């Protein structure tokens, strides 16, 4: 509501009151009796007020009830207004919805029908909010109107009083004498009339003593009325100017008299109405005011129409918002429903696929079992046949071998004698060669050990020299060359790694030799198992491949069928949707064109009305612009304050950054110090680790040497035991021979006699001498072993003593280094504390200087900003007025054009998206075909490579097996047969694969040709669509360019203003930065000078410390070198002595071994000769004894038994004694060996524990890396499985796509023919629809014309009614009665 409307409404009340006063005066002139009755009432307060308190309470209660009733009525009226506003709002919203539904397509209509509940609820809520807002606005307006009416009323009274005063002054100036006469006459008349009134009043009061309430009620109402009027005057006085207040104060008495007269008339009228006396009144004619009222009413009507249009626009906006919300809700519901359906369908598909897979697996298992049974039966038959053949061949071979053996037996006998001689000579040579080899091996080992020691010593010296150089370079170049440290550390690591690698390589070589021997034995066993497993694996692979091919073929067929069905259904749906969308688009275009024409007519009318409104709005805008300028000025001041705050914040940030940098520098220094400490500690650890490794390597060597010695000793013992056994066997044989000879000699005692006794004695002496020699040799061996043990223990003790000394020296060096570091760190900390204090003082000075500069700069900026604001505001006001006029007209035209373009673009985008999807699907088909070909080729290559590898491995195994026993040969033959069979099968497979390749290539060619045809068709379609899109884009560009030009002009203006402000700010910043730079340069100079002084002092200190350190290091080096020289000399002496001892011991051992070998060889020769003699003698004896046994058996037995018994007992005793001695010697040796082993085991345990700790750390790292690798491998395996599955799926899809592509090609042809038919049909339909749209447009225009005519008639009728009402008000008769203000208002509103 505008102020004009408020003033017009509020001015009606004083006009109505003037009518009421005139009516009252007319009633008083007509009804004299009524007036006399009123004059009888006493209007003075001379009478006594004898009213009671009870009556007052009753009146108060009545007033309260009346107030409550008024409140309830107000509430009911408000609710009724809200309902009416709601109804109006809903009517408008329904009308807007109906228009949208009428102009929208089928899809939108269906959507709106589905959203009706949501729309109705949203519209109702919006209408309630709008109605409440209107009611609040009406209340505010009523308050404003009441205030205006009061002001008008008071001003009217003021004017009346001023007029009366002016008239009185004129009268007093013209006729002062007449005024005196009139006063005397009036006084007389007043006296008479007053007396009569008094008398009447006294009589009436006496007659009406019971009617005291009338007086009290009249006085109360009159006082209440006067108070309310004066309260209105006081309220209005607050809003008056000083001149008006002075005028009011001058006319105070006049106002009081007029208020009393008005209140008396009002109270009398009210009491008369309550008593039933109603007086009629006729308003006087006032022609001048009627014309003003008519003009105001017309203006009010126009404003009302404007407000209605604005309300309708708001309601339409509300409807759009509600629609958007409802659409979003509907879309969410649809998405949820679709998601549920998709999940259900996916679950069903999964269940079906699982069921199919289970069936297929069951079928495959059954097929596999049948195939296995058949294969087993075939294999059994083959094995039986092969066994029969082998038996026959074996029997033949046995027969042949028996014949050959008989022949060879005769030949062997002849050759055995010659072979024996040759064997003896060969054995002698072998023994000699073995002795030589043993000597060479021992010498080589000694040389290797000496070379190793020399290498290790050289490496240690190198490492020590490098460490010395590194320390010197690090102390000199700590500040200058930090990069060199990394290089030196890298060199150290390389040295250590090389040393580790050399040790590991040596250990690996030994391990490889042992592993080779074990592998050879294991490979022989594996040959047999591998041959069997290969046969089984080959058979299983064949079965699995056949089963896989069957599965893949079945899956492909199923996938192809399902994919065909899905694609056909999808294509049908697409075609149906495209047809529907085309129809809807055609209908929308028709409706839009009809609507455009109607809009153009309506817009022309609106433009004419807007031109009028713009003029009025221009005047209002001027007022608003003035207010805006004030606001902008206030905002600029705020901006200036914000800029100041921002500057302060920026300066604070700078200070914080500087503080952070200082902290970071301090922390960096600490970190560098800590890094240095860590590096030094790491270097120490490395040195300690290197020393430990050297110790461990030395101990390992000792253990290995001890193990070698134990092995050699064990081998010697075995040789000795063998020799003893051979000797015992030879002695036994000799004893037997002697016994036999004795038997024969006893027979010939009579002949030979004493000769045989002498020979026996000689032989006994020889045996005794041999036993003595053996015992002496044993003693010598024991003594040599003891000496060797003692020498080894001495070496161990010397090495441990050396290690302890070295460790003690290292600890001393570490302690001295720690003390020096701590002293250096303390000095650094003190320097850092001094720097911090100086920096804190500098910061304080900087802050004070900054504050002073900021205050000076702020004042300058404020003055410049004020001048710019004033100039800019003037320009803005002029430009804004022009822009608003032009923008209002352009926006309407641009919005209409934009809506049309958006609709057209949406349709084209949808069609283009559909075509792009089809093109993408075809491309996928082609890519899948290519991938399948590549995958098939890769698999074939892999299979061929695997076959070649298997064939190579089999050949190697065959070669190894050929070297083995006869069993390996038999297995090799079988494996060859199996390999030949496999080769034949593989050749057949290759032929099959080549055939399948050819088929696949032919299919691919056909598919390529079909794909190329499709691509040509799609390209033609795309070209057409691109041409259409270009046209649309060009049109859109032109419209955009026009809109952008306007925006650019506006932006340019804004940028200019912003640029001016930025320039001011930049100038201020530059001045600040220049001042800050100067300060910073001065401070930097001072800091540099102070830093240079400190650096000089620090360098001098460092040079002194370095010189002292060098002296200490040189002394330490000299002492170390002297100590090392002494140690080396002592170690060299000990090594020489030990080497000489070893040589002596080895020489003694070699001599012993040579003698023992000779004895063993001689004993072996004798045993062979004895064995040969025995055979010959036994053969002769058997022939002779056979004849003599019967004769001499009894005599020989009796004579030989006692002599043989004695000899056997003596031999048994000797054997027992020798066995016991050997047992004792063995037990002593075992005890010593066990003691030595314990020592070695303890040392080995310590070494192992240290090694295990390192290994644990390394193993932990390796495990982490291994876990990562495992995860990667698992992921790769999973990815490989997925790829395999994807390949199978791709193959199935490709096969399906091939078929579908052929179907699509056919359908494309059919679709092209259908499109031509559809185009013809569309043209016919469009012609029919154009006619329909033209008819509809005509009907709409005619209907709108009729509506306009009806509205014009209604307006005329309303104007005529108003005229009639006014005429009726004028021509009312005097006898009509009034019933109060409310009834008069109702009558006027009814008119």
From Swiss-Prot:
Keywords: Cytoplasm, Repeat. Its main location: cytoplasm. Residues 184-201, 729-765, 934-949, 956-976, 1371-1391 have a biased composition (Basic residues). Residues 332-1275 are annotated as: 59 X 16 AA approximate tandem repeats of [KR]-K-X-C-X-X-X-A-K-X-X-K-X-X-X-E. The keyword Repeat applies. The keyword Repeat applies. Residues 291-300, 517-577, 766-881, 977-1013, 1353-1370 have a biased composition (Basic and acidic residues). Residues 170-213, 280-300, 370-429, 516-577, 729-881, 900-922, 934-1013, 1076-1095, 1104-1212, 1353-1391 are annotated as: Disordered. Testis. Primary spermatocytes and early spermatids. It comes from the Eukaryota. Sequence repeats lie at residues 332-347, 348-363, 364-379, 380-395, 396-411, 412-427, 428-443, 444-459, 460-475, 476-491, 492-507, 508-523, 524-539, 540-555, 556-571, 572-587, 588-603, 604-619, 620-635, 636-651, 652-667, 668-683, 684-699, 700-715, 716-731, 732-747, 748-763, 764-779, 780-795, 796-811, 812-827, 828-843, 844-859, 860-875, 876-891, 892-907, 908-923, 924-939, 940-955, 956-971, 972-987, 988-1003, 1004-1019, 1020-1035, 1036-1051, 1052-1067, 1068-1083, 1084-1099, 1100-1115, 1116-1131, 1132-1147, 1148-1163, 1164-1179, 1180-1195, 1196-1211, 1212-1227, 1228-1243, 1244-1259, 1260-1275. One of its GO terms (cellular component) is cytoplasm. It is found in: Cytoplasm. GO terms for biological process: sperm axoneme assembly. Possible structural role in the sperm tail. The predominant structure is alpha-helical. This is Axoneme-associated protein mst101(2). The lineage of its organism: Eukaryota, Metazoa, Ecdysozoa, Arthropoda, Hexapoda.
